A protein has these predicted regions:
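Noncatalytic, beta-rich nucleic-acid-contacting surfaces in large DNA/RNA-processing enzymes
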Residues: 1-356
């Protein structure tokens, strides 16, 4: 079952639902197989794509025999070249196995050809009874000379982690948008499916997309999405598929306008139609149509005026509290108000509430 990504994904989702802590892949904490210890589940490194059960078992046997790997350089010095080819090392890095040494995963990934060659050189030296670069030294603080690189942004890190595991484990791409999603009434698929609304906005990150054709040759798509609550699958009719084909890629996140279509007399059975697709970035960065800002008694009107001084597309309404009374004002001209303004204003102590 270690190589069955679908089963593993379901297994991990069930553990999350049961609030069982999952110890993420670690070169010094994990085992080749999944193992439960003290109510926690340690992720099995043999389940990482391209790594191979035998290879990771050999690497972990070395750890058990001679102690934990102290640094990444220590790992390089001790590992056998036959257990770490390019694909195997890529899988380990992308899954976060070496995060305890350095959370900058792309630093290691970008230097893999150099690392592989270094491991081979060390192995050859050992076979020839020559002292290796680090042999006989304390490697605790030794560093490998990595090549120049650009650190991954969180979105890139999670996309690469997804490739190595088949699902998101350390975090989810949608988590960073939680607050703005709440403000915009963007919900999880499960929330939308269970509520009574006929239409709603749902956010999802693409896990896979399959394009097919009907008997009449009309294209359609079947897309599997992931959100922070789980996974869901949607059917894309030809018009939606064709107009969005170029941007529908794995690991990209979207806000979907969904509509329930009850096709049977059984009200519990609902077909969900996709009416519109927008990238998350487009949604959160575009100006809001209308915003109401409720202010406490200690509001700073001059500061608010400065923050809302730029003309734009958003209708701004202010609700001012004074002596337990509320006064409503609408700014004469529309102003610029997007995610940037929201982030600044929501943290002001005199702002009671911002609604859209």
């Amino acid at each position: 079952e270690l190589t069955n990504t679908s089963k593993l994904r379901e297994f991990v989702e069930e553990l999350k639902r049961l609030n069982i802590e999952i110890i993420r892949p670690s070169i010094n904490k994990s085992f080749a197989e999944f193992k439960a210890i003290d109510g926690k589940l340690f992720y099995g490194l043999g389940a990482i794509k391209s790594v191979g059960f035998e290879a990771i078992s050999n690497i972990l046997n070395e750890r058990e025999k001679n102690g934990k790997y102290k640094t990444f350089a220590d790992f390089i010095n001790r590992v056998d070249a036959k257990d770490v080819n390019k694909l195997q090392l890529e899988g380990l890095v992308k899954s976060g196995v070496f995060d305890e040494f350095d959370k900058d995963r792309n630093k290691i990934l970008n230097s893999i050809p150099k690392i592989i060659q270094q491991i081979k050189n060390i192995n050859d030296d050992k076979e020839n009874n020559q002292s290796s670069l680090f042999e006989g030294q304390d490697n605790t603080h030794k560093e490998f000379d990595f090549l120049p690189h650009t650190p991954w942004k969180q979105k890139e890190l999670l996309a690469e982690e997804f490739k190595s595991l088949g699902f998101y484990l350390s975090d989810h791409p949608l988590n960073e948008y939680g607050e703005i999603f709440n403000q915009l009434k963007i919900m999880s698929y499960n929330q939308f499916y269970k509520n009574d609304d006929s239409e709603g906005l749902v956010a999802g990150t693409i896990m896979s997309i399959v394009e097919k054709k009907s008997a009449k040759g009309i294209p359609y798509g079947i897309v599997k999405f992931s959100d922070i609550r789980g996974e869901f699958e949607l059917f894309l009719f030809s018009e939606i598929l064709v107009s969005n084909r170029e941007k529908l890629k794995e690991s990209e996140s979207f806000v979907l306008t969904l509509q329930k279509d009850r096709t049977t007399n059984d009200s519990s059975k609902k077909r969900i139609n996709v009416k519109n697709i927008l990238s998350v970035d487009n949604v959160i960065n575009k100006p809001f149509k209308k915003v109401t800002i409720e202010l406490k008694n200690n509001y700073n009107l001059s500061e608010i005026s400065q923050l809302l001084s730029t003309d734009g597309e958003t209708e701004i309404n202010l609700v001012l509290k004074d002596l337990n009374k509320k006064a409503h004002y609408s700014l004469k001209n529309n102003r610029k108000f997007d995610l940037k303004q929201l982030k600044v204003l929501k943290d002001k102590e005199y702002v009671e509430k911002i609604t859209f």
